[in-house]
């Protein structure tokens, strides 16, 4: 049974949108957890980067499924933007929780060693280019001293910010109006 948006009040439509976004936020957070795990445990592989770069495609795919299955193929830019933003928001919350658990209970210094190795690599490149590396060192040292909760919160805010920006083109690409659907027939 389909529930069409034009049969609902604004409050009902928002409840529906948020319910789908929560489910799809779970899917996105699983992609991010796999990406994070791959980046930590198999850093020479491109799997972690590929999964991270698949983020906008996963959200767009889920938005198109929401549009098709719940809204009869019609979605406005505004509703698509809200759906995308809520999906990123819920995924960020779940990923923050997963990262906190990792940093608090599972990390034995692997994340810090990866940051230190990255600093050495970047420092060599910067020095070869004649750029001062002190600011990079200070930034990495600050990150290393953060507590698990602070580090998880930092990543959550970054994900929400990037998700807000990525929601704009995703909503623009995935929106469909009634007239557009009639033109396709």
Q: Which role fits each region the language model picked out?
A:
Residues 2-67:
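Transmembrane alpha-helical insertion/packing segments
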Residues 4-14, 174-185:
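Short, charged juxtamembrane terminal tails flanking transmembrane helices
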Residues 21-33, 53, 84, 88, ...:
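Alpha-helical transmembrane spans of integral membrane proteins, capturing the lipid-embedded, hydrophobic core
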Residues 60-71, 91, 123-127:
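Juxtamembrane membrane-interface segments at transmembrane alpha-helix termini
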Residues 64-80, 104:
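Membrane-helix interface/capping segments
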Residues 87-113:
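C-terminal halves and exits of single transmembrane alpha-helices
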Residues 106-145:
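Membrane-interface interhelical loops and short interface/amphipathic helices
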Residues 139-164:
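Individual transmembrane alpha-helix segments
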